[in-house]
Amino acid sequence: MVTLRADEISNIIRERIEQYNREVKVVNTGTVLQVGDGIARIHGLDEVMAGELVEFEEGTIGIALNLESNNVGVVLMGDGLMIQEGSSVKATGRIAQIPVSEAYLGRVINALAKPIDGRGEISASESRLIESPAPGIISRRSVYEPLQTGLIAIDSMIPIGRGQRELIIGDRQTGKTAVATDTILNQKGQNVICVYVAIGQKASSVAQVVTTFQERGAMEYTIVVAETADSPATLQYLAPYTGAALAEYFMYRERHTSIIYDDPSKQAQAYRQMSLLLRRPPGREAYPGDVFYLHSRLLERAAKSSSLLGEGSMTALPIVETQSGDVSAYIPTNVISITDGQIFLSADLFNSGIRPAINVGISVSRVGSAAQIKAMKQVAGKLKLELAQFAELEAFAQFASDLDKATQNQLARGQRLRELLKQSQSAPLTVEEQIVTIYTGTNGYLDSLEIGQVKKFLVQLRTYLKTNKPQFQEIISSSKTFTEEAEALLKEAIQEQMERFLLQEQT
């Protein structure tokens, strides 16, 4: 028979009393009522904040978006397949935030700032809220520095400034992403940090973009945020804000940043899916009523900081896909009204071999020549006017049989100007090279050449100028002005190269 020893029992009780922890832990918890399609309805969570992160029993994180009288609508940041009805959920007391640091440069991450490139963890000592307020009026200044894209058509006629928001819009397969990636490639050596946000893209397309950046050495100053088409809607909705938070981190450290959203219409579709599942009332095209606010609060974060804040900048280039050229659809009109201009890419131009397929007639930059160096303003002024007159004449010439000599000359000049705007993908040009190209075209030096010879001649001219007249580039880069000395050097180079070229073509 077991004997009970009172002293042993009292020792155990005494030990337990001594080890008793008096701390009272208050946890705001709730119970899962219903789960499915990336949405969970929770009973309880009485003091939860709008946008607060909540944690499910099995580890999935969600965001409380709908706060109703008897339940809370939560969107899941994962598939949530292990969440069960009746399981508990606890509020974390935190709003969605991500770690930020210099170590993110050169990495591919997801919307939660977790690396997805298989190169290990990223160290970060600081964090930023995913949804930060946009800079106020006093903390901004007007845009005055150019952000060179390396594309003649854009830098000469639709210039983009640091701190501007310029929409790239067009049908599918018209080279929208190519314009954006060329802009990133052109920032090499310009001290600009680039963030490329891929929302709902094919994983193969994102991999292709990353490979291009790696091959051209652009990943050194670029961060890629990717949520592909198979990602949960919540993460596709969050990805642009994550990219903006990373770009802001550098902007507030007095650096220049450029962020590309590819594309916000996919983010709007993900948000529509979440809203409809949360039973929010649908509006036009079944989008929720606050879809404008979805994009405006994102794009308003792009700014040129005032001198008090160090003059950092964040330039936003959202890309929106249209359906058969319809720019009057809901999302395109919303984004057009928020941005400071748009670059319109045309499928007809693309198919007729004009690439980049920029429709200069309906593309605008509301910042204009404030975002150009003086040298570019001096040579590019005539270009847009001559191209506009050419487009008008070309339409008229289709119906007229006999044209006078002046009209024929103007048409010939226009065709050569259109030819000089053509560029290969991933071959951005420096400002100096663009000035050479535009000056040669607008001053009639190409008129004597066949259209097929224009591209070849310009390539050779740029090479000749670089090797034989290096002082031309020095004058433009140091003074930012197209001086008389620079013009004389350029005229000399054109004449010398033209003689060489014509001899070469004859042989």
From Swiss-Prot:
Gene3D superfamilies: 2.40.30.20, ATP synthase alpha/beta chain, C-terminal domain (1.20.150.20), P-loop containing nucleotide triphosphate hydrolases (3.40.50.300)
SUPFAM superfamilies per the UniProt record, alphabetical: C-terminal domain of alpha and beta subunits of F1 ATP synthase, N-terminal domain of alpha and beta subunits of F1 ATP synthase, P-loop containing nucleoside triphosphate hydrolases
A GO cellular component entry from the record: chloroplast thylakoid membrane
Molecular function per GO: ADP binding; ATP binding; proton-transporting ATP synthase activity, rotational mechanism
Record's keyword annotation contains Cell inner membrane: no
Membrane topology per record: Peripheral membrane protein
Enzyme class at the top of the EC tree: translocase
Record-given protein name: ATP synthase subunit alpha, chloroplastic
Name of the gene encoding the protein in the UniProt record: atpA
EC annotation from Swiss-Prot or TrEMBL: 7.1.2.2
Record text on subunit structure and interactions: F-type ATPases have 2 components, CF(1) - the catalytic core - and CF(0) - the membrane proton channel. CF(1) has five subunits: alpha(3), beta(3), gamma(1), delta(1), epsilon(1). CF(0) has four main subunits: a, b, b' and c.
Main location: plastid
